[in-house]
Swiss-Prot record:
Disulfide bonds: none annotated. Protein-histidine N-methyltransferase that mediates methylation of target protein on His residues. InterPro entries: Methyltransf_16 (IPR019410), SAM-dependent_MTases_sf (IPR029063). Its main location: cytoplasm. The keyword Phosphoprotein applies. The modification Phosphoserine is found at residues 333, 338. It comes from the Eukaryota. It catalyses: L-histidyl-[protein] + S-adenosyl-L-methionine = N(tele)-methyl-L-histidyl-[protein] + S-adenosyl-L-homocysteine + H(+). Belongs to the methyltransferase superfamily. METTL18 family. One of its GO terms (cellular component) is nucleus. Keywords: Cytoplasm, Methyltransferase, Nucleus, Phosphoprotein, S-adenosyl-L-methionine, Transferase. GO terms for biological process: cytosolic large ribosomal subunit assembly; methylation; regulation of translation. This is Histidine protein methyltransferase 1.
Length: 339
């Protein structure tokens, strides 16, 4: 049975949620899996169409959603693919326990990406990064841009509920932003297409390997099983920086999100969200209140306002150990292993 979906009304009707409760009484039955960069590259098509992202203080490109739709139409005519296309057509921002909004770029992810540029991930040695519910991955890829520019070894872990989001949006965005870091291009061009040859993919993979930029992709819901998957490779409290945006809208999933945040943060966590999600119960205030009860030092939390227009937006800082005590001239090495 197809799950009922709904659409957030933040753009046309800022003070109204058009739909229904996104909460679920139980965890969705989706596979929890990890994948490597090398294996994921097979999902990259021969051409990628992109658009520059507005609203950022730095250059960033992302894959066009119509390009994702074209790829899905060409490779699969199943009912499952039809459901994916309905999501891409904009009928539903969310389908509870099926699709969690990862194809779209949300305003709070732009706020978070801009904030990342202020904290200087290189200087502060925040070189092990996890983004929970990454979607288009603009925040973590803004970190990638800094690490790549300075040739800094790092570990980047991209987590999303949907494996298709990782395959068709997250990874292409990583490739595109690497490409624009390495190739001369017209900075005024807002849209374009790049040819993706096997040699380009090999160059991409080899270049990240030479720089010791290690990437891993995790799909599935926030849960003990997901944490065990992370723990087997990294252990607990491994990530110097944990990022998330638009992940606190659903009260039923908030407990699991907090669990993942607490288990994985070593130094600093940044969580961006709307001050209130009308109709679904989530809010920055509720998130901050619950987190205060769980951290050792409530004074390690602070919230900054990023917008007061329409539905207000904020970013919560959890400075667990920040600046890190291990800051020195040598960046933290990523985990050993192949890309």
């Amino acid at each position: 049975m197809q799950a009922n979906g709904f659409s957030f009304g933040f753009y046309d009707e800022p003070n109204n949620l058009n739909g229904q409760d996104v909460g679920a009484d139980s965890l969705p039955s989706v596979a929890i899996e990890s994948d490597s960069l090398g294996h994921m590259l097979k999902y990259i098509p021969e051409k990628l169409s992109y658009a520059r992202v507005s609203g950022l203080g730095h250059t960033f490109v992302q894959r066009e959603l119509w390009d994702v739709k074209m790829q899905l139409m060409e490779q699969d005519d199943s009912i499952e693919s039809d459901d994916k296309l309905k999501v891409l057509d904009g009928c539903n921002d969310l389908v509870p326990n099926v699709y969690e909004g990862g194809y779209k770029t949300w305003e709070c992810s732009l706020d978070l990406a801009n904030e990342i540029k202020k904290i200087d991930v290189v200087k502060n040695n925040l070189t092990t990064v996890l983004e929970l519910g990454c979607g288009s991955a603009i925040p973590i890829l803004s970190c990638f841009q800094e690490f790549y520019k300075h040739r800094i070894p790092c570990t980047l872990v991209f987590q999303d509920f949907n494996v298709d989001v990782l395959r068709y949006v997250t990874l292409p965005n990583l490739l595109l932003n690497w490409y624009f870091c390495t190739q001369e291009h017209d900075s005024s061009e807002k849209h374009g297409t790049i040819d993706v040859s096997p040699s380009l993919l090999q160059e991409f993979s080899d270049d990240l390997a030479r720089t010791n930029i290690y990437c891993e992709f995790l799909c599935g819901c926030w849960s003990e099983e997901m944490q065990l998957l992370i723990q087997r490779t990294y252990g607990d409290h491994y990530f110097s920086l944990v990022l998330a945006s638009e992940t606190i809208y659903s009260l039923p999933s908030l407990e699991n999100f907090l669990y993942m945040l607490l288990k994985n943060t070593k130094n600093l966590a940044l969580v961006a969200g709307k001050d209130l999600y009308f109709g679904v119960g989530g809010s920055i205030l509720e998130f901050n209140s619950r987190l205060q009860k769980l951290v050792d030092d409530p004074n390690s939390l602070k919230a900054i306002k990023t917008s007061t227009q329409n539905v207000g937006r904020s970013i919560v800082y959890w400075e667990k150990e920040f600046p890190p005590s291990n800051i020195d001239s040598s960046p933290q090495s990523p985990l050993p292993g192949s890309l």
